[in-house]
Every structure is written in C-alpha cells, then in structure tokens.
Amino acid sequence: MGVKGYGEAPAIAYYNIPVEKMIADLEQKKNFIEKFAFTEPERYWHYLHHLLPQNNFLVCALDIAAWDMYAKLKQQKLYDVWKGNVQQNPVTDYTIGIDSIDNMVAKLKEKPWPIYKIKVGTPDDIGIVKALRANTDAVLRVDANAGWDLDTALKLIPQLKELGVEFVEQPLAKDNWEGMKILFQESPLPLYADEACVYEQDVVKCKDHFHGINIKLTKCSGITPARRMIKQARELGLGVMIGCMNESTVGSAAVAHLLPFIDHVDMDGPLLLEEDVATGIDFDYGKIIYSNKPGLGIEYTGLYHKEIKTKS
C-alpha cells in the first residue's frame, strides 16, 4: 500500500462552498488531480490553484494532504521538514462565543485556560469583558468580527486596555481601510486583521493599518500560501496569528506544524467537536502536544460518515 496523505477543508455555509460542491469538483477533476506527477507540494499547489480556481477550500484540503504525504515520504514530522523549533510554540486560545453574559462566564468557568478569545460586537461589549475579567486572570483577546464602526472602536479599545486585553481582532469592516489607518494611529492595543487579510495579496495592504494578520488555511487555500504569507508579514514587520474554522484534528494538525513560525494561534476546533475524525494532537492547557508519527502525525479514525456536531 502506498503512502497516504490527509487533508481537510470545513464546509462553511457563509462562503457558499458546501461539501457537495467540493465532492462534485473532485469528481469532475479527478483524473487531473490523480495524474499529476507529484514531486513536492509547492508545485502541486500551483497546479491545483489553476485547476480549481473557484474552490480555495478544496485546494486547501489537497494541499494539506500533499504536505502530509511529502513529509511521510521523507519519514519526518512536517515541522522538521521546515526546520521548525517547537520548543517556543505559542499556546492556543479558547474561544468564548457571543451569548448572554451569564452564559459566557459559565463557559469560561467550564474550561480553565491560559488565553481566551472573546467574541464581541454587542451593545454591551465592555460589560462582557468586565464580567469575564472578574472571573479570570488569564490573557484575554477580543474579536470584534468587523462589528464596530470607527467611533465605537476609538471609545472601546482604551477601556479594553484597562481591562488587560492583549489585542483586538478585526475591529472594523474589512473594506474600511481609511478608518483602520486612523485607528492604527490611535489605538493603545495591537490590531490584527482577519476578514481584511484573506489572500496573499492582502498582506501588504495591512501594513500601517494593522499590527498583525490572522491567517486561515481554508480561506487562503492551504499551507503553501500560508507559509508565503508568514514570510511576507515578517518582512513587513507584522505579527502573525493563525486561526481556525472549527476544523477537526486533521486541519488543526496542519496549523500545529506551523506554530514555530508564528506569534499567536487560535486552533481550538477539536475542543469544540463532539466527535473527531482523527487523533494525533493533544491539548495540555493550551500547549499543543504532537504525536511521534511522521507527516502531520495524525491517525485517521474513519468517522467521516458520522454526523459531526459542534457544541453550542
């Protein structure tokens, strides 16, 4: 039996790329995908990028699988292929989604963690953060999901700093570059781009508007472009975070192997699933523990046919 590589792309309704579309595109292009003379992942990604120009999610899954297989063929862990030092890896945050304040506090208490990512964008964002801060000394990060206007951001961010918030993610609408330039100059906290930085060409636009970027493998189309985005961000003096879209252990393992090269990570997807489809990474109070297997280090458990539910 040959070497197998595994990849993942979640189906997110908001982006209108359901599982059915990914399967249909795979079936339609199957011969081209399988017959490519694979030598290394970067060349394969460029081929896929042109073969499937309207399906970044599917390209991401195939790209991750290519890197997994490539490292397995070398009998190395993927981070070793890139000469990554995992000793100083960032720890992952744990996300508290928007809910009633009482429920958000309850979720925090249920999951003791060193870093929390707090979703905001409500009429009482400061009330939320105050209540959470009263119940933990952990690091707090705030994700506004493009939910504020400039005046609101200018008003709230100084108060968030007083509450010990570390940084703010995507405070304004993704296309409000004029507002972000003003906020960048005025904000007492670092600002990280999420919706405003999806593709490689977006990175340079973030300079002088954000202090860092949040890369999503699924959105940018895989590990290959993500590595180039990291390099570009470093050259521009931007911080780098990698986020998740509720991937299982398969997609999260891809993020895990990039940890030596980034500053922050949000990869709590497997913690939010009732059922996973693989094993291979563990969480020790935010610290990522790798398996001893090559490639992504995962073992596929064959549960893909079951319904995977996300906890509310």
Labelled PLM ranges:
Residues M245-S312:
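Flexible C-terminal active-site loop/helix
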Residues D175-M267:
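Catalytic alpha/beta core domains of metabolic enzymes, predominantly
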Residues K4-L73:
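Metal- or metallocofactor-binding catalytic centers and their adjacent structured scaffolds
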